[in-house]
């Protein structure tokens, strides 16, 4: 996709930005993602079947992503971005799923009922931290994961 975007940027002299998003989440997120699955089971006080939990998650609140889009949009409007650019929304703080569960158990009123190893890993799981990223220089994560998780779980 980036090859096509780069072509159009050069061919028509357009500022085009490709944003690479990681594990996004937010209060009204209804997608079939691991945090929503955990939340649904937590609310129902049910057993949560998970993988062994060694994969990494790069959790980014959707509000931080919106802030990045705002920054990039402003720079395009002010003609500060020329050509084709790639930016990531990488929090640079990956967390293993099993450590996320520990963090949630410290935050939540009731401990999660988790069975690790009950599910298989998916093909595209991330088992090592990808250091290569190109976050926009003016973009920083404003939200704190503990605060965001409390909001996400409505506590």
Residue positions per predicted region:
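Conserved donor sugar-nucleotide recognition element shared by glycan-biosynthetic enzymes
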Residues: 1, 31, 97
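Hydrophobic alpha-helix immediately C-terminal to the catalytic Tyr-X-X-X-Lys motif of short-chain
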Residues: 1-8, 38, 100-104
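Active-site Tyr-X1-5-Lys
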Residues: 1-17, 43
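A general structural signal for well-ordered alpha-helical packing
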Residues: 2, 35, 66-69
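Flexible, glycine-rich beta-alpha linker
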Residues: 17-34
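A glycine/serine/threonine-rich, flexible loop-to-helix segment
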Residues: 31-39, 124
């Amino acid at each position: 996709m980036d090859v096509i975007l780069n072509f159009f940027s050069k061919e028509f002299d357009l500022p085009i930005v490709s944003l690479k998003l990681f594990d996004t989440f937010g209060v009204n997120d209804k997608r079939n993602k691991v945090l929503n699955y955990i939340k649904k089971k937590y609310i129902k006080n049910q057993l949560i079947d998970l993988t062994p939990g060694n994969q990494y998650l790069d959790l980014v609140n959707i509000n931080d992503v919106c802030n990045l889009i705002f920054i990039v949009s402003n720079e395009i409007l002010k003609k500060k971005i020329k050509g084709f650019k790639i930016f990531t929304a990488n929090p640079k703080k990956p967390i293993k799923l099993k450590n996320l569960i520990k963090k949630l158990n410290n935050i939540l009123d009731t401990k999660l009922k988790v069975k690790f190893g009950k599910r298989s890993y998916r093909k595209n799981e991330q088992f090592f931290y990808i250091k290569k990223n190109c976050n926009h220089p003016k973009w920083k994560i404003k939200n704190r994961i503990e605060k965001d998780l409390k909001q996400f779980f409505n506590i």
